[in-house]
Amino acid sequence: MRILLIHSYYQQRGGEDSVFEQEYELLKQSGEIRKITFKNHSGWRGALQFIYSVWNTRAAGKVRQMIYEFKPDIVQVYNWNYASGPVIIQIAKKLGVKVVVNVQNYRLLCPSASLLHNGKLFTDSIEKRGFPWKAVRYRVYRNSFFQTFWLAFVVYFHKIAGTWEMVDQYIAPSNTVKKLFTEYKSYTDIPKEKFLVKPNFSIQTGILIRKREKHFLFIGRLSEEKGIDFLLDTFKNSSYDLIIAGNGPLKDKVLEACAQHSNIRFAGNLDKEKVKEAMSICTALIFSSIWYEPFGLVITEALSNGCPLIASDIGSPAELVAEGVNGIHFKTGDKESLQNRLDYWQNLGEAEKERYSFNCVSSFNELFTPEKNREQLLSIYHSLVNN
């Protein structure tokens, strides 16, 4: 089977980039595979990319040429915004190739792509059918009226052009994503039957056996949607220690909190081995996202390393973290709830914490290994090709 993967890299690396790279490496072991990548630029080049994203003839030509040469059975699209634009879907479909779209955000539901605005959930775009004028008025994308409008217009234009209906299969990484796309209104009107769930995966490289310390750990992008403000406010008034690792727009706020509160420490941006080590010695990892997190690769990384989780109770964390099994939940964005759960966790005996750790590895092996993922992907591809 011949498979062509297409992805537009973000300016700041994120989870979607990792998903693309991991699945590319995974599929290399299962058939002939090629990839086409684009890069989102900043400045005037980025502005031109953004404007041309409604119908990017250059990207279309690049994809068309690869399909002529490679003759793939499947084209799988990851991120199309904004370097390639959705036109690549039309090109593949018109050349007779089965098209799969990997949905790792909510851009087809709302121009915010996160259903979050000013630190709060913004669901107007999925509660009302039609063009998302309220989202445009509120400037939910980069606080820009024009950019929000244009992104919404690109999605709406391709609805009118029939692009979204040309996709043979949409893959959602969690039931949360599938539910938001299939049970709520949207201005794309994608048929429900085209969605299925296939979780992302992590690569387990062996578990480090370390004596766990008493501090908590946060690893991830230092940004609004990850609940950084709420997390810092909780630990500013807590006696427990917190180590924060990552990078992002709220890094300065994290450094300021570290300077003022000795129980909060910043570890910087860690490589894979350092992440593994950090997860092996903390008492638990805190996943504090305040939005409908589509998946959360750091959760599967924690599970693979036997690191219990204390997670918010909406989005994919509500699915991936099983209460009382491999972690516990707190009410999203609620400082008192998080503090109560921190107290609960620290009052557990060591044997009980070890049970959680053992269950983490069991959960990972059951659901999130590369082998499971390869099996699921190939099953999807074969089903499409055979039909």
What are these regions (language model features)?
Residues 253-273:
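Nucleotide-activated donor-binding/catalytic signature segment of Leloir-type glycosyltransferases, i.e.
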